């Protein structure tokens, strides 16, 4: 059965401790990092300054 005792067999160090596909917490962190990066990209393009053309057409 999956549970807290199943996580004891994995001994990760470094960044693998937080981002892995074996534990529920690791998968959750991967999803949150993906959603967060997508949100940051959307905000960047939405909030960046709009450049005005140098010469306005009449």
From Swiss-Prot:
This protein's UniProt keywords: Acetylation, Membrane, Mitochondrion, Transmembrane, Transmembrane helix
Membrane association type: Single-pass membrane protein
Lineage: superkingdom: Eukaryota
Leader sequence segment: none
Keyword Transmembrane appears in the UniProt entry: yes
A Gene Ontology term for the protein's cellular component: mitochondrial membrane
Subunit structure: Component of the ATP synthase complex composed at least of ATP5F1A/subunit alpha, ATP5F1B/subunit beta, ATP5MC1/subunit c (homooctomer), MT-ATP6/subunit a, MT-ATP8/subunit 8, ATP5ME/subunit e, ATP5MF/subunit f, ATP5MG/subunit g, ATP5MK/subunit k, ATP5MJ/subunit j, ATP5F1C/subunit gamma, ATP5F1D/subunit delta, ATP5F1E/subunit epsilon, ATP5PF/subunit F6, ATP5PB/subunit b, ATP5PD/subunit d, ATP5PO/subunit OSCP.
Protein name, entry field: ATP synthase F(0) complex subunit k, mitochondrial
Species annotation: Bos taurus
């Amino acid at each position: 059965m999956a549970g807290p005792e199943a996580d004891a067999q994995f001994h990760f160090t470094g960044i693998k401790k937080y981002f892995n596909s074996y534990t529920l917490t690791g998968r959750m962190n991967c999803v949150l990092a993906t959603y967060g990066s997508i949100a940051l990209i959307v905000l960047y393009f939405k909030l960046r300054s709009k450049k005005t053309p140098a010469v306005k057409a009449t």
